[in-house]
Amino acid sequence: MKLPVIFSLLAWSLTMSAADYDLNKPFGFCTVTSRSDATCTYHVTGGGCYTYPLPDGFAGKVAVLTSEGPDADMEKSIENAIKHNDVVILDGSKGDFMVAGRVDITVGNKTLLGINGARLCTRWHMTADMRRVLDDAGVPQMDTHGGGGMLPNGARVREEAEYHTRRIFIEKTGDATESFRNAGVLSLRRCSNIIVRNISFVGPGSVDVGGSDLLTCTGSTNCWIDHCSFQDGMDGNFDINNQSDFITVSWCTFRYTERSYMHQNTNLVGYSDREKTGFLNTTFAFNWWGEGCVQRMPMVRVGKIHMLNNYYTSTSASNCINPRKNSEFLIDGNYFDKGVKKYYSQVDAIAVTWTANNYIAEASSLPGSMGEAVAVPYDYSVAPCSEVPEVVRAKAGATLFGK
C-alpha cells in the first residue's frame, strides 16, 4: 500500500490567509539581473503600473479595448494598441477577444491587464470531426520520435505522428500554408520589463503539428506573468526559450479540456539541449497544474528554477517536475495531490534541492536532492505546503479586477 509522504507541513507556525501570500507585486527572478548576486536588483514596472483601477494621477498612455465580436480578428488591433501605449486594458465585458495568429510584443516597458473576465482566444480550434479522423488514421499509436516524411507542401517532418496529423489537416482544410499552426495568442519577442496580468488564454486544443504556444517568451527578460489562466494550448500553454531570462510565473493555472487531442505538454523552458547556459532563470510560484496536464510542469533545460508553493492535481500526469540538461532546481513547499503518481524525474540536471517542506500524496519513494544546494538571489517566504491547496484554489488564475 502506498502511504502519503509528508515533509514538515508546519514550516511556519503563523497561519496566513490567501491574501497574505498573494503579494500583488513583482517578486522572484523577475526582480533581479543575476542568478546568484542579490545586489543586482531590477524594478519591474511594465508600462508604469500593474493594478486596476489605475493609480490616481497615472500619466502614461492607456488604451482600453473591448471585443469586436466573435468573428472579428483582433490580432492587429491588440498589437497596435500595445505598440503605441504603455498600458493596454482588455475589457471582457463585451465578449471574447479572438485572434487568428499570435500577437507579438517586440518593444519593452509594457503592461497588459485583463478586466471583467477578459479572454484571449484562438479563432481556429480542434473539432470532434478532426479528432475522429485522426483516431481513424491511428495517429495516437504512431511514433513521436521518428518515421516522418515530406508533406504535400514540401515541408519535411521528422516524427510520424506529426507528419500524418499535418497531412490530414492539409487535406481536410485545403490549406497548404498550414495557417492553423499559428493558432497561438501572445509572443514576447526580445523585449524586457513586461507585465501580463489577469488574462485567460484559450487555445485550439493541443495537437502534434509543431504549432504555436498560447504564450511564448523568446529572448525576453524581466517579465512578470501573474494571475493568468492557460487552457488548451496547441504546442504548449506557456513556453520560455531562446535565452529568455529573469522570469516570474505566479498564481497561474494550466489545464486541458476535451478540446485537446495529443501533446498536452504544458510548460517547456529551454527548446533543446543546445540552449546557451546561464539563461532561463525562472520562478514558478503558487501555480496550479490541473485537469488534463500530461507533461512539462515544467520541463527545463539550462535555467535555475525556483518551484515555490505550486499545486498539482492532474491525475493524467506522466511527468510533472522534470529537470533536464544543465538545469538547477530549488523545489520548496509544493503539493502533489492524491492521484498524481508521476510527479518527478530528472535527466542530466546539475543540481536539484528538495526541501523538507513538500507534500506528495502518493509517493512510493522519496525524491532525493543532488549536487550542491540550490539557492536564489532574492528574498521570499514559503507557505506551509499543507496550506497550498486551499490558497491556490482560492486565488490562482484570472481572479483579479472584476468578473
Features from the language model and the residues they span:
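Short, T/G/N/S-enriched strand-turn elements that build extracellular solenoid repeat scaffolds
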Residues: 75-82, 98-107, 122-126, 323-324, ...
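All-beta strand scaffolds that present successive hydrophobic residues in beta-strands
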Residues: 112-114, 194-196, 223-226, 247-252, ...
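Extracellular beta-rich repeat passengers
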Residues: 299-403
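Loop/turn elements at helix/coil->beta-strand transitions in domains of secreted/extracellular proteins
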Residues: 84-89, 119, 194, 245-246, ...
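Extracellular "leader-to-stem" segments immediately downstream of a signal peptide or signal-anchor
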Residues: 4-13, 17-87, 96, 130-168, ...
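Conserved catalytic-core segments centered on acid/base and nucleophilic motifs
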Residues: 227-230, 236-241, 252, 284-291, ...
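Right-handed parallel beta-helix
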Residues: 96-278
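Residues in short coils/turns that link rungs of repeat/solenoid architectures in beta-rich domains
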Residues: 203, 232, 256, 261, ...
